[in-house]
Amino acid sequence: MRKIKDIRPIQLKDHKLYVINQLKLPKEKEWLELSTYQQVAEAIEKMIIRGAPLIGIVGAYGFAIGVKQILDEGRSLDDVRDVFDRLKNTRPTAVNLFWALERVWKKFERWTEEGRSGEELVNLLFKEAERIDLEDYHANKAIGGYGQVLLPERCNVLTHCNTGALATSGWGTALGVIRSAFENGKDITVYVDETRPYLQGSRLTAWELVEEGIPHYLITDNSAGFLMSKGIIDAIIVGADRITANGDVANKIGTYTLAVLAEAHGIPFYVAAPTSTFDLDTDSGKDIPIEERSQLEVKKCGGCDIAPEETEALNYSFDVTPASKITAIITEKGIISHVDKEHITKFLRYRGV
């Protein structure tokens, strides 16, 4: 069994959150201190930290930080709703953020009704955020364990965006499957989509793979289909920002394109995500709000203009892949091999989710 590094993107010290500034990678590994909920919200919005599971975890920590901040300032706990709303409104697509915030909000309501206050209340909220953090890490390890079984002993696997330790509490979802396969001695080569316009593949996934010593090639997004046509790609694994009741998946823009190409070439297309990514209150992908970010992210690269100033750009951050194009969804509870509403509902119910 190979030795794998344990990269962790966030640390909690003295009720302050320290995060790796992912905008500086791969050139510089800079840790930023976040000591107010406003700083946490800004870090999520600016994608200093990103990845659906991680923004949920950071949102939970941000809520605890916000409650402490309000109490330290001598304000009423009625103002805590402002903290919740500010964090909730940072990014609209990833459901993990809303799931984590709802969880800590319900605990906050219960504990205040029980008469918990002051330092005791703050400590309870930080412990709950730490619990969410730890649960995610264990979920990722389980996802990796289940998912690596799907990969042959020798496998060229293509992945999109960043779904590794930097997108989670550690280890990762889709990249966690690859980590687990490599750790277990499989001959894995990873083909990393650069993932325009934010380049999470080239900046973050490639950085993680270098850290781990996992063989990989960085590819342009528009070369994926050609590699499939040449028989180079054996499997595709991506993450998810939201999975609806019928199995449609919202993920980083470009995922749908890969799914269509995978189907055309007979290549298995896997989605790896914790069960907290399922949104059973949303029927299908057409109901998912899709974040549209600044056109400057498309028109600039590395601080340089790459398009005429007069040109307008579209910058949808996510797309939706229909359930019919997904081979299986890998979760910490096991693998959903029939991706439709009936099988998802039964799977989650039988496993106590």
From Swiss-Prot:
It is an enzyme of class 5 (isomerase). GO terms for molecular function: S-methyl-5-thioribose-1-phosphate isomerase activity. Signal peptide: none annotated. Pathway: Amino-acid biosynthesis; L-methionine biosynthesis via salvage pathway; L-methionine from S-methyl-5-thio-alpha-D-ribose 1-phosphate: step 1/6. Substrate binds at residues 50-52, 91, 200, 251-252. The record marks 161 as: Transition state stabilizer. This is Methylthioribose-1-phosphate isomerase.
